[in-house]
Structures are given as C-alpha cells and as structure tokens.
Amino acid sequence: MAIRTGFCNPFLTQASGIKYNPRTGRGSNREFLHSYKTTMSSFQFLAPKCLDEDVPMEERKGVHVGTLSRPPKVYCNGKEVPILDFRCSSPWPRRVNIWGEIDFRGDKFDPRFNTFHVYDIVETTEAASNGDVSRFATATRPLGTVITLLGMSRCGKRVAVHVYGICQYFYINKAEVDTACGIRSGSELSVLLAECLRSSMITQNDATLNGDKNAFHGTSFKSASPESFRVEVIERTDVYYYDTQPCAFYRVYSPSSKFTNYLCDNFHPELKKYEGRVDATTRFLMDNPGFVSFGWYQLKPGVDGERVRVRPASRQLTLSDVEIDCMSDNLQAIPNDDSWPDYKLLCFDIECKSGGSNELAFPDATHLEDLVIQISCLLYSIPRQSLEHILLFSLGSCDLPQRYVQEMKDAGLPEPTVLEFDSEFELLIAFMTLVKQYAPEFATGYNIVNFDWAFIMEKLNSIYSLKLDGYGSINRGGLFKIWDVGKSGFQRRSKVKINGLISLDMYAIATEKLKLSSYKLDSVAREALNESKRDLPYKDIPGYYASGPNTRGIIGEYCIQDSALVGKLFFKYLPHLELSAVARLARITLTKAIYDGQQVRIYTCLLGLASSRGFILPDGGYPATFEYKDVIPDVGDVEEEMDEDESVSPTGTSSGRNVGYKGARVFDPDTGFYIDPVVVLDFASLYPSIIQAHNLCFTTLTLNFETVKRLNPSDYATFTVGGKRLFFVRSNVRESLLGVLLKDWLAMRKAIRARIPGSSSDEAVLLDKQQAAIKVVCNSVYGFTGVAQGFLPCLYVAATVTTIGRQMLLSTRDYIHNNWAAFERFITAFPDIESSVLSQKAYEVKVIYGDTDSVFIRFKGVSVEGIAKIGEKMAHIISTALFCPPIKLECEKTFIKLLLITKKKYIGVIYGGKVLMKGVDLVRKNNCQFINDYARKLVELLLYDDTVSRAAAEASCVSIAEWNRRAMPSGMAGFGRIIADAHRQITSPKLDINKFVMTAELSRPPSAYINRRLAHLTVYYKLVMRQGQIPNVRERIPYVIVAPTDEVEADAKSVALLRGDPLQNTAGKRCGEAKRKLIISDLAEDPIHVTSHGLSLNIDYYFSHLIGTASVTFKALFGNDTKLTERLLKRFIPETRVVNVKMLNRLQAAGFVCIHAPCWDNKMNTEAEITEEEQSHQIMRRVFCIPKAILHQS
C-alpha cells in the first residue's frame, strides 16, 4: 500500500491553512437550491483518541470533540482528496455528470432517447412562475402535482421523466352535498371548496408554522380559487351491496394532493367521500390503460402533436443525465418486455464502536461519542449479477491483511479500495456523497432498515444536523426517512423510504424464506450458501481498533465479508424480481410492494376494475354490525392455500392488520398415534376458489331479503353467518369483482407457468418469480375483506368465506363416512384397490381431523401403497360429487405413521420415507443441547422403531382413567431406555456442561424490560457485579441453572439489589432467620463461572425440563393430558434413594444393621456399581408390573 501523506489529526498538528476551534460548534455553510452538500468550510470534528498514536497509551481514552475549519477530505492510496470537489479525481465511481450548479456533461452530450425503463415513481408539488405560459405551467397554477418517473433509457442514460396534468379526484354524493350546502351545481361547489381552503388553519397561521414547507402550502391555499377545481356530475354506484342503486355524484378534480387531502378531511367531514385517498401516482397508472409502475415506456407526440420538453441543468430536480417534461399522452407503455437495464446495487454494512467509559456498551446513534468506524460498500450490476467495486470507508488508517487481498485477487474479485478519514463526519459525508454521486438504484444489507440506515440517519440528523432530503434522487425536499424504528434490534420491522433508492433488507428476506432457530448472518449463510464467516466478536472490536492500522484491517476484512455474504444471498433469492412482479401486477410502486403490506395491492387492482364497471369505493368502507365467533383474529393462515411445493412468501412488513381471519375450526382432531395409513386431502386455493365459486363480493351481497325475493331461487345463495342471513346473487345476475380479479390472475399464472419449461434458465427464473407474485396477491384477497380497519373492509364477505369452508369440510367428512364406511361400497368405488386389502374384517375409514383446508382420513385394513394410489381419485370423486368449480380437492400426502398432537400440530412419516412436521420444533434455540438431543432421539425412535410404534398406537387407545392401574405396553421398553439413559447421564458426576448451556437474546437494554427476573438478565447483572464482559443488545447470553447453595442465594440478593427489585423476606413457621424464596431465574449462572468455581448443576430442573418438553410432544399418546404424561414418563426413571452417609456411619457405629441398603464401602463411602443387566431388570420390573401406587421419586 502506498505511504500516506498528510494524514491529519488536528489535535496533534496545526497544518497550514487549517484553523481548529475546539467546541465552537458548526461553521456556517452557504445554502444552495439543492440540500446535498457541494462545499463546506468547517464541520464538527469527532474522532477517537485511540487514533493518537504519538501520545501515551493512558491518554488514548475517549473522543476528541470540536470544530475543524477546513473542507472535508479523504485519504486514498497515500493521496489526499477533497470529498466534495467534483473537479478532482474521485476515489469512488461516479455516475452523475451534474454537481451543484455545474454541468459536466460537455457540449457534445446528446440528451435524446426514445425508450426508457421505470423503477421508481415520486410525487412532487410544483407552483408555476408568473411568466411561464407553457402547458406545463398551466397544469401547476396555482399549485399542481407532478409525477416523476425515475429510470434508465435503453441507451444507458439515467433519466427522470416529469409528467404534468395528473389530477387527483374524489367523489361526493350530489344529493347529500346539495342538501348540506344549499347548492345545485358544480360551479357552486367549486366556490365552497376554494373558500374552505382559504379559511384553513394552515393559511391563517402560515407565518408561524414550522418551516418553509408549511408557509408554501399556506400561500398556495390562499391563492385557491374556484378555477382551481373542475367539477363534473356523473352517475356512479357505491361498491357496497347489490341493492345499492346508481345515483349522481360530484367528481371533483384537484390539481394538488395537498388540496385533495385537506378537503377530504375538512370539507363537511360528516359527508362520505369516495376515493379521496387515491394518490396521484395511482391515478396516473389507473387512468392510462397499460401504464405500469415497473417496466418500459416509449415517448411519442401528444394527442395534438405536442412534444416533450428537455429541462436545462439549472432546472433539474435530480442528478439524472436527462430530465424531460411531458404529459401522460406523450407516453406509451411497452408490453411483454421483462428485460432490465443496467441498474446498480449497493450492498453495505457498518461497524460501530462505543466511545464512552464502557467501550463494550452497544452503540447509540444519539450519543456523540458512539461512532461509525467503518463502512463496507460492494457495488454490483444487477442484470449481470457481477461485483464491480469494493470500497472500505475507515475512520483512521487501515491496512487490509495481504492474505485477504490475495484471496480476493485469486478469486477474480475487484481489489478493495480503502478510504481513510480523520473524523467520523468526513466518513459519513463521504458515504452519503457516494450514494448521491454513484446513485445506485437498489441497496441491500443485513438488518439495514433497523440498524445501519437508522444509525447513519440518526447520527447525521441529531449530532451533525445534516439534512438528508437531498441525498436521494430528489435534490431538495425529497424523502430520506425511516418510520417505526424499533429499539429491540431484530425483533421489529421498520420502513425505509428513499426517493430513487429501493432498500431490500436481506434479513427480512431470510426470515421469510428460511426456517431457522437463529437468523444471525452466519447461520443464514451456512444454511443458504453453505458458507461460514470469520466471526469477530463485538468485544474484540475496541481492542483491534485501538491497536493500529493492521488490526483495523482485520475489522475491515470482517466488514467486507459481511457485505459479500449478503450480496450472495441477494443473488440467490433474487427478491427484486419477485417484488417488481408484485408491483407491476398490483400497479403500485416497488417501495409500496416492499413496505406497505397486502391491503394496498388488492385495493389498487379493485379500484381499476370497479371504475371500469361504474362502481366507486368509499373511503374506509362500512362497519359490519355482528359478531362471528368462528372468525378468529389471525394473520398467517392463508399462506397455505396454494401448492405447498411453491413456498413463496411476500417480502417486507405485514399488512398492518389488527383484525384478521383464520379458517374456521370444524372438529377437533382425534389425537393419538396412528400406524395405519392416513391420507390428507387438501382444497386447492381454498379461499380464492370459494370466492369464485359462490360469487362473493361487496357488489353481490345484500342483507335484505326483499331485494332478492323477486329473483329466481337459483339466482342467489343464502348463508346464515353470526345470526344474520346474508344473500349473494349469482354471477348471471351480477359478476363478483373479486371473482373476476381472481379468475384473471389465476389464468395469467397458469399461462406463465406453462411457459417455464420451454424457457432459458434466466427467463425461467424471471417467469417463476412472476407466477409467485400472482400467488401472493391471490392469497391476499380473502384477508383484504376481513380487516376491520383496512382499506375496504367487508366482514360479511370474510365471515361467509369461513362459513362455507366449514360446511365444505363437514360435507366432505359426511360423504366419506356415508359412502365408504361399508367395505363393499368402498371396493365398488375403487376396484383397483382390492389387491391391497389386508383384512376385510379390520377395514375401517374415519376422518380424524379437519381444519381450514385439509381433511385427514385414516384407513384400517388397507395397505399404505394401495391408499396412496387412489388418493387423487378419491379427491376427484368428492370434488365432483359435492362442489362446483373451481373448488377441488387434491391428494397432498399419505402418512405411514402419524402423531397427531393438537390442532395444527403433528409429526409423521409420509409415504416415501420423509418426516413431516407442522407446528412442532424438535430443536428449539432456547433449549440446551441435552434436551434437544434426547427429544430428537425419542421422536426418531417413535417413528422408525416398529415395535415402539405399535406399542405407542396401543397406548394412545387407552383412556386417561385406566392409566393409574395399567402398565405400559411392553413395546415401550425402548422408549423407557432412552429416558433412563438421559437420567443416568444427568446424574453422572462427569457432566459436560456445554450440553446444558441455554441462551437467550438480550433484545433491549435491561432497564427496558418490564419483568427483569429472567434467567439471561440474572446472568447479565452477575457479570456487571463481577465487572466481567457485559453483553450487548442483540447478543445471546449463555447460562446454566445451578443447584441452590448459600453462595447462589447470596448472589441472588446482590442481583436483586442491582435490578432494583430486592427479594422479599418470607418468615418461616419457626423463629430464626427469614429465608428468601428463589425462583428458577435466580439460579441462572454464567457457564464460565460455573466451570471455574465447580458449581453443581440443578439436576432436578434439567430432568424436569426434559420430561416437560417430551410431555408436550407425546401427550397425544396419553389422552392429551400433560400432567399424566409426565407421571407416566417418570415411571421409566430408576428409583434411587438418597443416603446420608454421615448418619449411616453413626447408626452403624451404634450397632444398627443396614437392611436393603446399597452396598457401601465404609472406607471410601461410595456406592458400589450395579450391573447394567440388573439395572435394566429393575427398570422393566418397575415399569411393566402394575404398581400399588405411583412410585415416589426422589
């Protein structure tokens, strides 16, 4: 690496031309028309004192704070480079050619292009200047909304296309407005609307409101006039209810979203508004057939030959290569082109360090001394999936290990560029300048929404007072913001919205695509990529950072490695393809598809279809006035409605549902263990198919029988739901809008899937993501109607869907029992199975479980091979006999063995040998290895040992009352041996403590916990008390449970004082010192402390925990009674007697003889060995002979 020159620490040197004023605040900077920084003469200086290599070690604690009077700079390859001076050679790649007020494109630059791709859409508000007489000024006088399409031309230019003339509009019932306001025409309504705006509080107080933005709106509201609005009278129908008649509505066109939003809230709030919350972007996409939110467009002359206008650099809103102004008639969408231009991906990761008295504390962005010390940035080409640049931003000098640099070179990767900075602000302003100058279209990382972006934004806002509104695509007044940032690290989802920069967090993708006990990056990389990372514990970072450039290079390697793993995850799962397909299908922006949930996807689609058929959508819908007990709050049960082999989940946050629906439970499962074949029939796309088959919709529903009694009985269906009779007309009377959407989407999905086999590998991936996106949207339709506070709730429809689903399951059960219970009728229906009959006498068929969309059918007396062969025929016969298309049953799987535990919880072996589990976690991250290992052993024995399986099936048929006088089936001996072995291991004096370590995540600071008497918090406080290494937020704290001793009790008292919750004294029955009552969490201890101090583990706790864990899983064998299961499993434990050796010796010395006691060596005082054969004999005698009473366990 080149030798650095001029590496400046202002606290050690006074370089020429640089004036340093400690703690004098920020220098004043010149304000430009853009808010991103292009020049700075001074800035706040924050840097760790550990970088001061020329001062004594004892003086290197803490952080330098002050103001540095010079422009920010960066050191790269030994050279000093100004960060903000665009004329200087840049240490990072640039894609912009305009910076500040200077245009670097050159005279030969040709702005022309014809076709362009759109990836993001931004709404801005514009007010025309007085001298402008263009058609674009007319559209923004006094105020207008402009839609900006951001993307790239076919020829590679980054473009921004500003679309004028897009008006929001809303509807309001004419008769109601005329009555309320005493008017009769649209012109009179325009006058009232303008008066409402001019008299608004914003207008009256614009001089005192916070900031220019409100003042601007106040000025524009003052200038509102009747001419600002266009009002039409039009006939439309409310989408709610079949008996709603068409009537006259005022359609009010407003040039500004600010006008529309204010009027919908404040102009006669008691009057219902329709579609007032539909934004201008949605109107642009919906009112122009074929327009897409993500895809290709081409430019064309307008209806009257009007042409587009190229903006000069001085008027550009962004730093795009070209900006043009146009109207919507200058645009034409290009269908069936799924190609992507050369969009760029920024993959980044930050490393932080606390600079306070405790360097191991978790960094807080609001603390001035907690610093970002490194940022790794990997820059990719998305369509080529190639890594193009590697950058490492480092606070202080940094030398990457030569080994690592050579490894990257050997792998054919770009050589990392190391950028070094004197202060944190220079590092952060350089990173933000890279974001602005390189202008990547997409960004990713691991937990960047909750941590990396949040930390950077908070630090720049609260510590450095740097506005970020100009660092997205928009140069000033843009969006660069995070909502709902959670303080509990990984536990909460937030939203990040940056104009022109789509953030896809791979942590969110990993939690939806993978089912793991831990979602740390290392765990995800092992599972998804079969790679592991070189871990660097957070506790080591302060020491590495303070030790010089070589060890800082180790941190840099770690930082780059994390970004590289995330980049590989991105191109493995390709979330951008699936989400862009969702955005295109739902006609919403990509950012909305990621962060705004399911509701908006269905709403926009329904809006377009409703509009084409003369319906309008009321804001907020209408509340349902009934209770439906079978409709249970839930969010997650509709994902299973389509083919299981295509497990695709929507990305991003949930839809914000506070009320949802779960498939109605029809009958409780017949719990137990089955060794007869159990076939599972599933309804394909249950809820979408019910909506289609029964024509359910807002528009086909009526609550009034008088409305339908004039129709033929075959023209409507009646359902009783929650005590109300609901009527839905058939499709020949009025077609369901929801049904039409589903029919079109499913037909589209089928066509796309048919194209996949004949496509190239790249095209097949894209098509697969498209069909998956359709599946996601289809599965959202049912939930859309069932959210009470949603966009357009209709609980009647949602409740009817679950009612029909319940009836379908009941009718399926009755059909099976009525038609196939008799062996002769079963053979008649399935003559091919006669050769697979094992015993005609033993033949029996029974539906043992039915829930949501599945029916579990047990067959006795027929081989599993035979049942597996007729499964599809069985499904077809039932579907044809009972249901109308598109409802159909499919044979999903056939179990060879099945442990049916409770509703939605089972474990089984399906035909073919694969183990399938639902709702059961054999290996839980909160359990120790000992418990997980034995729980797994017990399940594997149950499923794979035929002797144990038969015995378990026998046991599951025994009633609860019989077990007090009944022995275990002899075949359960193997089960007992495993439990006895577990007991032997845990009572052995040579325990491996590592097998008993449990962990729990410190999800927030201890002070933020309501209940602090938790095991991992106990260990946290003990480490504080012993001045050990303190865990940080998001770290998992290991602990074990120890036996209660005087030392443990003393520690518990100290911990109670530390957490501010002293243990209460409870006086005993006798006089003397009061005893403190300890709970399990008080017995938690640091494993290292246990090992070093020879503390004993709490054997009773661990074995009880194992028995408890096993009982939850195996209670289905014993009548689903957990307590009974625990008692029965304890029968397998060898009975032991605790012998008081001192007392035994005293009694023997007094002449007493020990009878039935173990053999003891009085000299060694140790228990003699019992042979394994004798021990097994004792176990079997105890378990399989009927005891007179439940044996006492010590």
Curated annotation (Swiss-Prot):
GO terms for biological process: DNA-templated DNA replication; viral DNA genome replication. GO terms for molecular function: DNA binding; DNA-directed DNA polymerase activity; nucleotide binding; RNA-DNA hybrid ribonuclease activity. It catalyses: DNA(n) + a 2'-deoxyribonucleoside 5'-triphosphate = DNA(n+1) + diphosphate; Endonucleolytic cleavage to 5'-phosphomonoester. Keywords: DNA replication, DNA-binding, DNA-directed DNA polymerase, Endonuclease, Host nucleus, Hydrolase, Multifunctional enzyme, Nuclease, Nucleotidyltransferase, Transferase, Viral DNA replication. The keyword Zinc does not apply. Belongs to the DNA polymerase type-B family. Replicates viral genomic DNA. The replication complex is composed of six viral proteins: the DNA polymerase, processivity factor, primase, primase-associated factor, helicase, and ssDNA-binding protein. Additionally, the polymerase contains an intrinsic ribonuclease H (RNase H) activity that specifically degrades RNA/DNA heteroduplexes or duplex DNA substrates in the 5' to 3' direction. Therefore, it can catalyze the excision of the RNA primers that initiate the synthesis of Okazaki fragments at a replication fork during viral DNA replication. This is DNA polymerase catalytic subunit. It comes from Varicella-zoster virus (strain Dumas) (HHV-3).
